[in-house]
């Protein structure tokens, strides 16, 4: 576009670039290419690559490393712009990526896995016109930032321009993946010292086992009858983390998380050695800041967390179901929830107008130039 052509050079320099180089067949072969077989999962569909981070502001910080590459995501695999996952193992060179990907002050500079989020569900490549019309690229990052501002551990998030074998592939959102290695990098110990689960319509084990998870679900079913049992809940789950996690979803009106869409995209990690409580992490929240009509009226309230749209799905093992049982029946939990909500919604708290707006604007400034390049790559995809 002549309106933005003059901005392209500055747009390409406004964030770091990540270059991925590999045998073209690893990407595009009908038989073995991961971009030609986007439904492929697991190590059978992992391909060796070379990556290079390029920092236009600090060229001396640029570096190269070996890694593995997989597809990432679920529904977005049908989009032309796909999410990807970088895996670092000794097989490829270094066991971990050692680089200040999320800034010098981030809790860790070592990473086993990095997800390259295409944010396809809320972008110009989406098949839904309302998604394309409301593209921001920021909902999921804002959710993670908000969870951190509320005082909880969260997954790091940043932005890069991605190149695949020299071809510009668009603006991507690298983020940490909450699992056992994430626990090791953030809290110490070894990755085997952690259990991690993801609920994508049912509970999937990412690391360790879900034995303690099942015990927690069973324990929560007794909370209505016994104050003693409620007081023991802290042994199973970080209650303040649970409350604030739900507050983030309620504040942002999530449509693909612990809501009536199917109790989806819930990531939790706990330390098993020594034993600790489960903590929930904001994850894949791009379907948020919307109302039930999909018109992006950010102030329109709608009833989330009901089971009405879940059909015959069993949602009793959902963390949102634990929350519902507590919210509806336990006075002490209700008071605790009210205290947390007041803390975050008023007096400059993380969910106050001034706090939330400042945090969102900070991310807007980070990518407002970079999206010019994204629009050149993908802006006319659905026209």
Predicted features and spans:
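Conserved ATP-binding subdomain of kinase catalytic cores across diverse folds
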Residues: 20, 38-206
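Middle-to-C-terminal accessory/interaction subdomains
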Residues: 7-44, 49-50, 75, 79, ...
